[in-house]
Amino acid sequence: MLSNPQRTRFRKQHRGRMKGISYRGNHICFGRYALQALEPAWITSRQIEAGRRAMSRNVRRGGQIWVRIFPDKPVTVRPTETRMGSGKGFPEYWVAVVKPGKILYEMGGVPENIARKAISIASSKMPIRTQFIISG
């Protein structure tokens, strides 16, 4: 269940820069517990899905999980052993641009110890340092 946009206005994007902190999506909105990013990074759709699966496997029934990031940036890759020039590569995979402070996952309907365990497993799937936070 890898997520990527169904259609975009343009097939390719500039790489851009990840400077500053996240001013949007940095508060807990849906659940009671959350995983917050502490570093800037590109997080691929595969990494997001791996974290979601790890959490849902731990929570079982009763708990709810919300994924607060969406991979909407295409990353292009050139074929190997290709000479310089002749245009930009083809879109290979999708990433979510994450800045420090951004909430990655939220969880509710479970005790704190279970949530802490599930979120720590999901954080090990992420390529960045994260922290567990509680609303309120």
UniProtKB/Swiss-Prot annotation:
GO CC terms of this entry: chloroplast; mitochondrial large ribosomal subunit
Cell location: Plastid, Chloroplast
GO terms under biological process: mitochondrial translation
Keyword annotations from UniProtKB, A to Z: Chloroplast, Plastid, Ribonucleoprotein, Ribosomal protein
Pfam families, per database record: Ribosomal_L16 (PF00252)
GO MF annotation list: rRNA binding; structural constituent of ribosome
Subunit structure: Part of the 50S ribosomal subunit.
HAMAP family, per database record: Ribosomal_uL16
Family assignment from sequence similarity: Belongs to the universal ribosomal protein uL16 family.
Official protein name in the record: Large ribosomal subunit protein uL16c
Organism, scientific name: Phaseolus angularis (Azuki bean)
